[in-house]
Protein backbone atom coordinates (compact mmCIF):
# COMPACT_ATOMS: atom_id res chain seq x y z
CA UNK A 1 0.00 0.00 0.00
CA UNK A 2 1.35 3.42 -0.88
CA UNK A 3 0.44 6.44 1.20
CA UNK A 4 1.26 10.04 0.37
CA UNK A 5 2.38 12.89 2.57
CA UNK A 6 -0.48 15.35 3.27
CA UNK A 7 2.03 18.22 3.38
CA UNK A 8 4.09 17.83 0.21
CA UNK A 9 2.49 14.91 -1.66
CA UNK A 10 5.56 12.67 -1.78
CA UNK A 11 5.34 8.96 -1.02
CA UNK A 12 5.71 7.97 2.62
CA UNK A 13 8.21 5.37 3.77
CA UNK A 14 7.88 3.04 6.76
CA UNK A 15 10.58 3.38 9.36
CA UNK A 16 11.12 2.06 12.84
CA UNK A 17 10.47 4.68 15.51
CA UNK A 18 11.25 4.68 19.23
CA UNK A 19 7.97 3.02 20.31
CA UNK A 20 6.50 1.70 17.06
CA UNK A 21 6.80 1.79 13.29
CA UNK A 22 5.79 4.99 11.59
CA UNK A 23 5.13 6.57 8.21
CA UNK A 24 7.66 9.27 7.47
CA UNK A 25 8.28 11.68 4.64
CA UNK A 26 11.81 12.05 3.26
CA UNK A 27 11.13 15.59 2.03
CA UNK A 28 9.38 17.30 4.93
CA UNK A 29 9.21 16.59 8.69
CA UNK A 30 5.84 14.76 8.51
CA UNK A 31 5.67 11.64 10.72
CA UNK A 32 2.64 9.46 11.55
CA UNK A 33 2.93 6.65 14.12
CA UNK A 34 1.42 3.30 13.13
CA UNK A 35 -0.67 2.14 16.10
CA UNK A 36 -2.62 -0.66 14.40
CA UNK A 37 -2.42 -2.90 11.37
CA UNK A 38 -3.11 -0.92 8.20
CA UNK A 39 -4.78 -2.73 5.30
CA UNK A 40 -6.58 -1.48 2.26
CA UNK A 41 -7.61 -3.32 -0.89
CA UNK A 42 -8.79 -1.70 -4.06
CA UNK A 43 -9.62 -3.70 -7.13
CA UNK A 44 -9.42 -1.80 -10.39
CA UNK A 45 -12.46 -1.72 -12.61
CA UNK A 46 -11.69 -3.83 -15.67
CA UNK A 47 -12.30 -2.38 -19.10
CA UNK A 48 -14.51 -4.14 -21.58
CA UNK A 49 -12.48 -5.99 -24.17
CA UNK A 50 -12.84 -4.57 -27.67
CA UNK A 51 -13.10 -7.12 -30.46
CA UNK A 52 -10.21 -6.23 -32.77
CA UNK A 53 -12.09 -7.68 -35.74
CA UNK A 54 -15.05 -5.33 -35.23
CA UNK A 55 -17.38 -7.68 -33.34
CA UNK A 56 -20.47 -9.29 -34.82
CA UNK A 57 -21.09 -6.36 -37.19
CA UNK A 58 -17.85 -7.09 -39.06
CA UNK A 59 -19.19 -10.50 -40.14
CA UNK A 60 -22.56 -9.23 -41.48
CA UNK A 61 -21.68 -8.57 -45.14
CA UNK A 62 -18.81 -10.96 -45.79
CA UNK A 63 -18.52 -13.64 -48.45
CA UNK A 64 -18.38 -17.37 -47.82
CA UNK A 65 -16.06 -19.94 -49.32
CA UNK A 66 -15.58 -23.71 -49.47
CA UNK A 67 -13.33 -23.90 -46.40
CA UNK A 68 -13.97 -26.74 -43.95
CA UNK A 69 -14.36 -25.85 -40.27
CA UNK A 70 -11.65 -27.57 -38.18
CA UNK A 71 -14.04 -27.88 -35.23
CA UNK A 72 -17.32 -29.20 -36.68
CA UNK A 73 -16.28 -30.13 -40.27
CA UNK A 74 -18.97 -27.85 -41.80
CA UNK A 75 -18.02 -27.44 -45.49
CA UNK A 76 -18.42 -23.62 -45.70
CA UNK A 77 -17.01 -20.65 -43.83
CA UNK A 78 -17.31 -16.87 -43.96
CA UNK A 79 -14.03 -15.08 -44.58
CA UNK A 80 -12.45 -11.64 -44.58
CA UNK A 81 -8.92 -10.47 -45.24
CA UNK A 82 -7.09 -7.85 -43.18
CA UNK A 83 -3.62 -6.40 -43.36
CA UNK A 84 -2.25 -7.31 -39.92
CA UNK A 85 1.47 -6.93 -40.62
CA UNK A 86 3.59 -4.63 -42.72
CA UNK A 87 2.64 -3.83 -46.30
CA UNK A 88 5.19 -6.23 -47.79
CA UNK A 89 3.62 -9.21 -45.94
CA UNK A 90 0.56 -11.02 -47.32
CA UNK A 91 -2.88 -10.29 -45.88
CA UNK A 92 -4.24 -12.49 -43.09
CA UNK A 93 -7.46 -14.38 -43.87
CA UNK A 94 -9.91 -14.77 -40.99
CA UNK A 95 -12.63 -17.44 -41.14
CA UNK A 96 -15.87 -18.00 -39.24
CA UNK A 97 -17.85 -21.23 -39.54
CA UNK A 98 -21.17 -20.88 -41.41
CA UNK A 99 -22.79 -23.36 -39.00
CA UNK A 100 -24.83 -21.16 -36.61
CA UNK A 101 -24.43 -23.66 -33.74
CA UNK A 102 -20.63 -23.68 -34.12
CA UNK A 103 -19.44 -20.19 -35.13
CA UNK A 104 -15.80 -21.24 -34.66
CA UNK A 105 -13.23 -18.62 -35.72
CA UNK A 106 -9.75 -19.27 -37.06
CA UNK A 107 -7.20 -17.66 -39.34
CA UNK A 108 -5.03 -18.78 -42.19
Curated annotation (Swiss-Prot):
Disease: Leukodystrophy, hypomyelinating, 21: An autosomal recessive neurodegenerative disorder characterized by global developmental delay, loss of motor, speech and cognitive milestones in the first decades of life, and diffuse hypomyelination of the white matter and atrophy of the cerebellum and corpus callosum observed on brain imaging. Clinical features include nystagmus, ataxia, dystonia, and spasticity. Other more variable features are feeding difficulties, poor overall growth with microcephaly, optic atrophy, and seizures. The disorder is progressive and may lead to premature death.
One of the GO biological process terms: transcription by RNA polymerase III
Entry domain remark: The TFIIS-type zinc-binding beta-ribbon domain contains an acidic hairpin motif (residues Asp-88, Glu-89) that likely coordinates the nucleophilic water and magnesium to cleave the scissile phosphodiester bond and release the mis-incorporated 5'-ribonucleotides.
Lineage top rank: taxon: Eukaryota
Residues the record lists as binding Zn(2+) 1: 5, 8, 25, 28
Keyword Nucleus: yes
Function: Core component of RNA polymerase III (Pol III) which synthesizes small non-coding RNAs using the four ribonucleoside triphosphates as substrates. Can mediate Pol I proofreading of the nascent RNA transcript. Anchors into the Pol III active site to constantly monitor transcription fidelity, cleaves mis-incorporated 5'-ribonucleotides and restarts the transcription process. Once Pol III reaches the poly(dT) termination signal, can induce Pol III clamp opening and transcription termination.
Residues involved in Zn(2+) 2 binding: 69, 72, 98, 102
Zinc finger feature spans (C4-type): 5-28
PANTHER family: DNA-DIRECTED RNA POLYMERASE, DNA-DIRECTED RNA POLYMERASE III SUBUNIT RPC10
Gene: POLR3K
Stated name of the protein: DNA-directed RNA polymerase III subunit RPC10
Organism: Homo sapiens (Human)
Molecular function GO terms recorded: DNA-directed RNA polymerase activity; nucleic acid binding; zinc ion binding
PROSITE patterns: RNA_POL_M_15KD (PS01030), ZF_TFIIS_1 (PS00466), ZF_TFIIS_2 (PS51133)
Motif (Hairpin) on chain: 88-89
GO terms for cellular component: cytosol; nucleoplasm; RNA polymerase III complex
Subcellular location: Nucleus
InterPro entries documented for this protein: DNA-dir_RNA_pol-M_15_CS, Rpa12/Rpb9/Rpc10/TFS, Zn_ribbon_RPB9, Zn_ribbon_RPC11_C, Znf_TFIIS
A Pfam family matched in the record: Zn_ribbon_RPB9
Assembly and oligomerization: Component of the RNA polymerase III complex consisting of 17 subunits: a ten-subunit horseshoe-shaped catalytic core composed of POLR3A/RPC1, POLR3B/RPC2, POLR1C/RPAC1, POLR1D/RPAC2, POLR3K/RPC10, POLR2E/RPABC1, POLR2F/RPABC2, POLR2H/RPABC3, POLR2K/RPABC4 and POLR2L/RPABC5; a mobile stalk composed of two subunits POLR3H/RPC8 and CRCP/RPC9, protruding from the core and functioning primarily in transcription initiation; and additional subunits homologous to general transcription factors of the RNA polymerase II machinery, POLR3C/RPC3-POLR3F/RPC6-POLR3G/RPC7 heterotrimer required for transcription initiation and POLR3D/RPC4-POLR3E/RPC5 heterodimer involved in both transcription initiation and termination.
Keywords, comma-separated and alphabetical: Antiviral defense, Disease variant, DNA-directed RNA polymerase, Immunity, Innate immunity, Leukodystrophy, Metal-binding, Neurodegeneration, Nucleus, Transcription, Zinc, Zinc-finger
Entry-linked CDD domains: Zn-ribbon_RPC11 (cd10509)
ZnF bounds (TFIIS-type): 65-107
Family that this chain belongs to: Belongs to the archaeal RpoM/eukaryotic RPA12/RPB9/RPC11 RNA polymerase family.
Amino acid sequence: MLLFCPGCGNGLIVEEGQRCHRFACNTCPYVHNITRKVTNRKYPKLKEVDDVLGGAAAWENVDSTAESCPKCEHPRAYFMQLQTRSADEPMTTFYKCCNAQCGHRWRD
